[in-house]
Amino acid sequence: MKAGLWLWLMLGGAVGAVCRQGVVLALAPLVARLGFPVAVLGINVLGSFLLGLTLALAGRGVWPPEVRVAFGTGVLGAFTTFSTFSTELDELLGRGAVGLAALYAGLSVGLGLLAAVAGRLLGTRL
């Protein structure tokens, strides 16, 4: 990988991390009120959609491969978070909220997959 692409990857990662933290902070009152991790759920579903779109556009040559690396791996890799999903799932289970944990896991995987497919389909039509 070219040196300049590494820089774009790092900058993209910084942007994605800042965006994720902004969403988490903005939705913290709602998460506290609901007792359900809607912030990370929304982040991961949106990220899945955008990655599906990015991969489709890069795969068709609409966007150069460098955009896939900088935006897909950098921005979206830092924006989305499997580790936080896992620890939030563990927290729900730890407090005995088995039903909410199952709902969170099901929604995360199901909506994430649907969003990725929707993004890919949109990307094949643009």
UniProtKB/Swiss-Prot annotation:
Membrane topology field: Multi-pass membrane protein
Keywords (A to Z) from UniProt: Cell membrane, Ion channel, Ion transport, Membrane, Metal-binding, Sodium, Transmembrane, Transmembrane helix, Transport
Instruction: Give the CC-aspect GO terms.
Output: plasma membrane
Q: Does the keyword Transmembrane apply?
A: yes
GO MF assignments: fluoride channel activity; metal ion binding
Query: What reaction(s) does this enzyme catalyze?
Result: fluoride(in) = fluoride(out)
**Compartmental location:** Cell membrane
Q: What is its biological role?
A: Fluoride-specific ion channel. Important for reducing fluoride concentration in the cell, thus reducing its toxicity.
Q: What is this protein called?
A: Fluoride-specific ion channel FluC 1
Q: Which organism is it from?
A: Deinococcus geothermalis (strain DSM 11300 / CIP 105573 / AG-3a)
What's the gene?
fluC1
